[in-house]
Amino acid sequence: MSDSLERYQEFTGLSIDRPDEGLLRIVIDTPGKLNAVDATKHANLADVWPVVSRDPDTNVVVVHGAGGAFSAGGDMAMIDDIMADPRYRAEVFREARDLVYNMIDCSKPIVSAIEKVAVGAGLATALMADISVCGRSTHIIDGHTKLGVAAGDHAAIIWPLLCGMAKAKYYLMTCEPLTGEEAERIGLVSMAVDDDAVIETAMEVAARLNAGSAQAIQWTKLTLNNWLRMAGPAFDASVALEMLGFAGPDPVEGVAAIREKRAPRF
């Protein structure tokens, strides 16, 4: 590992390399599980961004999933632990806030390449990126209310700004999935492209940013993200209510329904 990447050694479950000078690539990598996010990855997806922000060798970041999928969200073992252990629930509350705020505060522009599926913590990472490139048939869903908890993670801070309150309420309350094509139509993602062109397009966007004025681009991000910072209190409340929900009976039924592949009976 080169000296410029040694700072990232601790972030297991994330494959991190530098395909070009000034460009950092972060790949969520869970073989055979559509890059589901376990406890370690959840922590690392929160903690990696301050390191990126301080990295003098990085001008821009591309984040995507391994094997042609972004992420299927939190794995069931992690959800079981959140429900069972109040101390771990408090830790996940901190990590969920850190993931969002650390991406907002990361000085470097972040480009997400969203392939096949994006759910849960994976969706949070995908949509909190500064520019999101999505496959037309990519499956996007915020499944919190179907699980039996409030839509926390990232939803309250970013969906209303991206697609408007009416669409945000509809998709977050109903858990209706949407395609990348529909996500682009309502403004949830920056652009939708052919499924086989997602990574290539994201890298092209990153190359344009990498060739630009780093200071001007970083200060533009800093300025625009003040809109997100103003939504911080609503976001904090949403994550707190999500965690409160995990202490109740509804997610027990929600998890059982997922495992038994049936509709939940709340």
Language-model regions: role of each:
Residues 176-182:
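Acidic, divalent-metal-coordinating active-site segment for phosphoryl/phosphodiester hydrolysis
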Residues 30, 55, 85, 212-213, ...:
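Short loop-to-helix capping motifs
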Residues 99-105, 113, 119-173, 186, ...:
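CoA-thioester-processing core
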Residues 76, 96, 156, 165-168, ...:
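A general structural signal for well-ordered alpha-helical segments in protein cores
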Residues 1-66, 101:
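Conserved CoA-thioester-binding segment of acyl-CoA-metabolizing enzymes
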Residues 65-102, 118, 148, 230:
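Glycine- (often His-adjacent) and acidic-residue-rich active-site loop
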Residues 133-138, 189-237, 243, 247-249, ...:
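C-terminal long alpha-helix characteristic of the crotonase
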